């Protein structure tokens, strides 16, 4: 997911704003499948500048709360639409149904 709204608007005021939108998008996709961020097993964060890591990490940590899925962060040469951050995740509905929030 990158920082596109449902209307297709790209949010690019700051890397924090991008990250917030990306996480909202992930929550929406997970919600449509009957899941939440608590169902996430692993995330991969793609950054175009590793200097943005601390700011992205702050937003990510607030969104995830006490849940701490496995995570990798990778610096990349570029992302679609000039995005500075993209996050992909692997989730399982079984973890949510069983009341488990992490491995």
Task: Annotate each language-model stretch with its function.
Residues 1-103:
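Short, polar/acidic, helix-capping and beta-turn segments at strand->helix junctions
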